Amino acid sequence: MWLAGSVLVAVVLFFVYLRLSRTYAATSDGADQALQGWDMLHGNWLLRGWTIADVTYYTTEVPEYAIIELFRGLRADDVHIAGAATYTLLVLAAGLLARGRSTGREGLIRFALAAGIMIAPQFGNATHLLLSQPDHLGTSLPLLLMFLMLDRAPRRWYIPVAAGVVLTWVVIGDRVALLTAAGPLAVVCAARVLFAMLRHRRSLASQWYELSLVAASVLSFAAAELTVRLIGALHGYKITPVESARMAMLQLLPRHVQATVGGIRNMYGADFIHISQNSPFGPQLGGLPLSVGVALAALHFVGLALAVWGFFRAFRYFFDPADLVSPVLATGIVINVAAYVPSVVSARIWDAREIVAVLPFGAVLAGRMVPGALARLPRRRVKQALAFVGVGVLACYLAGLGFGAAQSPQADNEQAVIPWLEAHHLTSGLGLYPEANLIVMDSGGRVAIRTVTWWSWRAVPRAYESEASWYDPRQSYANFVVTNSADGGGASRAVA
């Protein structure tokens, strides 16, 4: 029953999320991974010649794009399909992890609570964050599946080994997993070992499972680092420096804290402040009356409040051997946010992509922690009233999701120029980052625009999300330039 129901829900959610994703135009950030997946699909498994951003997604979303392109080819819609598929699976994985070992009605409530919190991304910036190009969200999917294994599987020797393999695989593509999974797992397990030794006089041998998980977490970083260096030694992709590793000035921390809180509200759909201020950087109304949009965002505060409640309750189980996953998730939120706030990338709400794991982790904690606490309420009528309120809130979430999915799809600004370029036999040119890779993806590779940086006297190759052979005059030739309105999102035009 659970399998059939999950498959049905997954199919419905995928098409709804696909519609919602299409309401936010694709950008070059997503096109980068689409082109890398296309290159990988055509045999360049190590992405030789590529210079990639500080987060490569080499083992997460890039293979996902390759699989999609295997069946569909290189198309403009690949970004939306990948985003919808990832988020659909993430919602279901969060629900299953929140369910734990519960069955029947209790299991359904836990599943619905976690999935319900995530089910309706806020129309606008949150849609872009959760349903568009890779932004660390896809990293959370294999991590949730690993936590599901730790939650359900017996304590056998091969479980830490499997966890180490998953962590290594994910860290290769996204080092944020060190903050959200590997580090927290090592901290919680090490603390439990130390507590058991000091409090209960337990030997290290009797705690082999926890020690094995600590070792798996630590070794996953070493194995991932070794793998990345091996790829480099084999002339695979190169990585640009990590911008987020730099710290912000101390006087900017209050603004960073404010932006972090705003980003978390936004990813939970509870960003009514930017709606009420009519900010272009926050949620969009899409024709919805302002009062309704603010009220709907305020309702999402219910989900955020439940996640916060579950987050704090999870620390009660920090040393409880019956529940390993909950304190690890809560610790992951703490470490991720603590590393994010003082960094240079936390100045604006849309930078919350660096802490996007807070959404699925918080939703899971709400599902695992809150129903048990509510079940202990003494009065039956109070429980019934809360159940009706919960159903009503979920209905409002679904109504908001349906409204967002019903909006008109938005084509990116570069699609309109492609037919004109092809009609004039202009198929190899130069452009800046916002349009270059996006045009290549939109055209299915028929039009090649190569990213450059314009200096006062010439153009130079831009070694960022680009491939070295594009700039080899023996293989490439450019006879026109694509520009747009200050390269800030206007419609593109070509200059031969």
Regions inferred by a protein language model and the residue ranges of each:
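Membrane-interface alpha helices of multi-pass inner-membrane proteins
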Residues: Y158-P184
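Membrane-interface helix-loop-helix junctions at transmembrane boundaries of multi-pass membrane enzymes
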Residues: R105-L108, V193-S212, G282-I333
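Transmembrane-helix motifs of polytopic, lipid-linked glycan transferases
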Residues: V7-A10, I81-G107, L145, A305-V308
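Signature aromatic-anchored transmembrane alpha helix within multi-pass, membrane-resident enzymes
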Residues: W2-L8, A215, L219, L329, ...
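Membrane-interface micro-motifs in multi-pass membrane enzymes
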Residues: D54, Y58, G104-D151, W350-G362, ...
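Hydrophobic/aromatic-rich transmembrane helices and adjacent perimembrane loops
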Residues: P134-P142, L179-T180, L288-A305, A322-P378
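Short hydrophobic/aromatic helix or loop-helix immediately within or flanking a transmembrane segment
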Residues: D32-W38, T51-L74, G263-P283
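Short periplasmic/luminal acceptor-recognition loop of GT-C membrane glycosyltransferases, typified by
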Residues: V55, A423-V460
